[in-house]
């Protein structure tokens, strides 16, 4: 679904573990890494799209994760001019995304990025919470920064300010 301004409705997924780390996936046959994301189909809610994309791209079912938080706003990024398909109608100039923060409830071994017939990723790993903001492709960086800032207290309740705060005994 592409809106009147040319932005495709999309969901983004941040999966965290109990150690303040997030799921980071490598795009198939590329050296670029990102969070799982994907388009919202006609008649689908953002949550339904998130669960569909989660299964298609990561091989996880709803009962294997817990939704901790959903972004308050739709966040947008523009595609670089070289990536815009000008012959496509309607023309897509970028993505508008609703983001979901999930906690993994199952074993890591249950993650299977290669399970679908058309995988988006060929590898994954856990990375430190803020790592993706520095490593994602530049045109997504602002959205990642905003998402991670918004999700920080939910993803790492004791680490949002950089670590646990200890009071000195007087």
From Swiss-Prot:
Residue interval(s) of motif Nudix box: 38-59
- Please provide the record's keywords in A-Z order: Hydrolase
**Keyword presence, Translocase:** no
Q: Name one Pfam family in it.
A: NUDIX
GO CC field: cytoplasm
Might you give the EC number(s) for this enzyme? Answer: 3.6.1.-
What are the TM regions of this chain, as residue ranges? none
The answer to whether keyword Transmembrane applies is no
Q: What cofactor does this one take?
A: a divalent metal cation
| GO BP terms in the entry | mRNA catabolic process
Any single GO molecular-function term of the entry would be: mRNA 5'-diphosphatase activity
Instruction: Family membership, please give it.
Output: Belongs to the Nudix hydrolase family. RppH subfamily.
UniProt name for this protein: RNA pyrophosphohydrolase
Q: Lineage of this protein's species?
A: Bacteria, Pseudomonadati, Pseudomonadota, Gammaproteobacteria, Alteromonadales
């Amino acid at each position: 679904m592409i809106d009147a301004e040319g932005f495709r409705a999309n969901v983004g997924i941040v999966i965290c573990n109990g150690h303040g780390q997030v799921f980071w996936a490598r795009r198939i046959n590329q050296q670029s890494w990102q969070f799982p994301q994907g388009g919202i189909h006609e008649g689908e809610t953002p949550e339904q799209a998130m669960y569909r994309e989660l299964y298609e791209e990561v091989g996880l079912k709803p009962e294997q994760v817990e939704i901790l938080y959903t972004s308050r706003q739709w966040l947008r990024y523009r595609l670089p001019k070289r990536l815009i398909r000008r012959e496509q109608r309607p023309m897509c100039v970028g993505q508008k995304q609703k983001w979901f923060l999930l906690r993994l409830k199952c074993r890591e071994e249950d993650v299977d990025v290669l399970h679908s017939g058309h995988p988006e990723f060929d590898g994954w790993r856990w990375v430190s919470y803020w790592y993706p903001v520095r490593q994602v492709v530049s045109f997504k960086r602002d959205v990642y920064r905003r998402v991670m800032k918004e999700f920080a207290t939910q993803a790492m309740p004791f680490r949002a300010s950089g670590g646990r705060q200890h009071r000195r005994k007087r």
